[in-house]
Amino acid sequence: FSMLDAEFACILYDAKEDTFIAARDPIGIRPLYYGYDPNGTILFASEPKNLIGLVAQILPFPPGHYYKDEVFYCYCDIAAVKSYHKQDMETVCCNIREKLIAGVQKRLVADAKVGFLLSGGLDSSLVCAIAARESSKPIQTFAIGMSEDAIDLKYARQVADFIGSDHTEVIISREMVLDALETVVELLGTFDITTIRASIGMYLVCKYIHENTDIRVLLTGEISDELFGYKYTDFAPSADAFQKEAQKRIQELHMYDVLRADRCISVNSLEARVPFGDLDFVKYVMAIDPEMKLNKYGKGKYLLRHAFEGLGYLPDDILWREKAAFSDAVGHSMVDYLKAFAEKYFTDAEFEAENLEYDHARPFTKESLLYRELFEKYYPNQSQMIIDFWMPNKDWEGCNVNDPSARVLSNYGASGK
């Protein structure tokens, strides 16, 4: 399996020997779950809901592992680094550019029509800009927002005009957001706050694409943050701390961002492809000296930005734009609607009483309690599927916040407000 350059979850059965091997790709881009029935027999499923009632505890199959003869074996720890590259910044940035371009090129090969999610942020904009250069005709891009003046719609429109894409804007309402909430929790099998927030917009835009186009493959910009840093990693106290945080985020991706991307896209009969998750690209970036990845330049993700600087891929104000989180950039009002709905859903007394029912990943806001109760409706007593709420590293100064959104950080840029 270590020789495969692919996104996969599989079970291979040898009928002659009556044996099988189960395996999952190193990042966990494709879903796979397992559990043991009352007789101790291991059961597998691509969706956790298929194991409800069959096993006592449902767990995600560990990425980069295969299972054979009752034992899990690690064939690839994608986040592990034996030694860092001994290269100067220009060489590193050149390699970043070439490897990301190669990652996009691989994922343009398809026997079905390919489309692109374009948020207007750095990551999805780079994927679209590279693809536009590689394509002989305009690519099809899609953006979503709560209103026509949503932050990212403005920037996505600017990128689309610059790269000459066939661009579609999907405008969603408060009612659409609230109506989709329970569906999103069920299809993802999560109670995580930021995953659910971001998934609603992605689910709705993918639903639109499925119902209104013949596109069947979608490229997205996930996994860049884990590699190059979030807004909160600006507060990393050292290069070693930055690297350890990046390793943790990569190892847990299958419970958060790539879970969102796969499920929201796949449930709408589309195939998710993630260029930033290209194995060669991930391995290379993880082995860059973390001293170079610290925000010492006044901008996060400096290496990624500099790699494409001055080459005409993107306008400077997009290439150097401050980050706006996807769930925020869809429209600040979306998160506000969800919070307001949760505030009315529970009284203060109900919140104080009901959150105590949970020991693992105890809800700490009315919004998180709402998501947890929806989760328990479909996945009773299965909270161990998610290790905890995705949150900034609270051990770092400046990161002890009570919300996963970058909006609450002191270094959140003006373009995201």
Residue ranges of each PLM-predicted region?
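ATP-dependent adenylate-handling active sites, centered on carboxylate activation for C-N bond formation
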Residues: 15-21, 26-39, 81-312, 326-341, ...
